[in-house]
């Protein structure tokens, strides 16, 4: 799946993400469950500072990319192919992390399972955001993307939100989740070529080449390149990246 291969073009999470997650584990076992781990950014970023990680994802393609990292061979990591609702777990966990994955889960099944798997007093942390924040081209890009979806699907998307709009709302709202805090990381500057920026876009489900098909992917890239060239310097785009982290306790019922 090309979507998984394009994940390497996403910006890294800020260091503040990892320090925050480690703070949340301070009084608990240094064992994490990375739920919907994708290509393993959270697990691989924490593994030198924890005792063990179970990293679960439904996509074999994502896990293949994760396992290709040199750090992925650590005996402290168990890569598990399966759904978080049914995958074999090895609790208790000092922290469960769902990084840009909670929206894919059946929460009525998953949250009670998390409650059972967490050590006493341990937290669930959910993350959102590894995309440009307040980029100079955001207005043009957004208008194009909304029109592109409307042309593809026959109607304008009612789910569309900018990163700022998403940051203003909780990532997870569910009766079984008791939010205890949140943090929006400080912005950090990231640069990449237009070609790599487009590959990053193709790592997102709405814009994946598997979703769009070959013809629409070429059209998408051509229009986006026209927009982005106006903002690039020597072919490079520079933008800020931020992440919203929120954490809380999970009840079984």
Regions found by a protein language model. Name each.
Residues 98-99, 107:
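A short beta-strand submotif of the Rossmann-like class I SAM-dependent methyltransferase core
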Residues 31-33, 39-86:
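Class I SAM-dependent methyltransferase SAM/SAH-binding core
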Residues 163-253:
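Conserved Class I S-adenosyl-L-methionine
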Residues 88-96:
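A short acidic, Gly/Pro-enriched loop at the edge of an enzyme's catalytic core
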Residues 1-27:
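Conserved class I S-adenosyl-L-methionine
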Residues 115, 119-190:
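Conserved catalytic/acceptor-binding region of the Class I
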Residues 26, 47-51, 106, 119:
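Short conserved AdoMet
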Residues 105-114:
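A short, conserved alpha-helix within the catalytic core of class I
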């Amino acid at each position: 799946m090309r979507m998984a291969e394009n994940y390497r073009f996403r910006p890294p999470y800020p260091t503040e993400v990892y320090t925050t997650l480690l703070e949340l584990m301070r009084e608990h076992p240094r064992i994490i469950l990375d739920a919907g781990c994708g290509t393993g950014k959270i697990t691989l970023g924490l593994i030198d500072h924890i005792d063990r990680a179970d990293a679960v994802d439904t996509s074999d393609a994502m896990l293949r990319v994760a396992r290709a990292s040199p750090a992925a061979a650590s005996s402290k990591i168990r890569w598990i192919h399966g759904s978080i609702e049914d995958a074999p777990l090895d609790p208790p966990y000092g922290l469960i992390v769902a990084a840009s994955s909670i929206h894919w889960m059946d929460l009525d099944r998953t949250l009670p399972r998390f409650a059972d798997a967490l050590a006493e007093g341990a937290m669930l942390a959910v993350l959102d955001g590894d995309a440009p924040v307040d980029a100079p081209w955001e207005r043009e890009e957004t208008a194009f993307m909304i029109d592109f979806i409307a042309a593809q699907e026959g109607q304008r998307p009612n789910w569309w939100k900018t990163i700022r709009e998403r940051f203003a709302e909780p990532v997870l709202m569910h009766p079984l989740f008791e939010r205890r805090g949140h943090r929006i990381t400080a912005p950090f500057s990231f640069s990449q070529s237009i070609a790599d920026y487009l590959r990053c876009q193709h790592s997102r489900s709405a814009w994946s080449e598997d979703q769009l098909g070959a013809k629409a992917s070429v059209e998408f890239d051509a229009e986006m390149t026209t927009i982005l060239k106006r903002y690039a310097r020597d072919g490079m785009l520079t933008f800020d990246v931020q992440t919203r982290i929120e954490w809380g306790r999970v009840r079984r019922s």
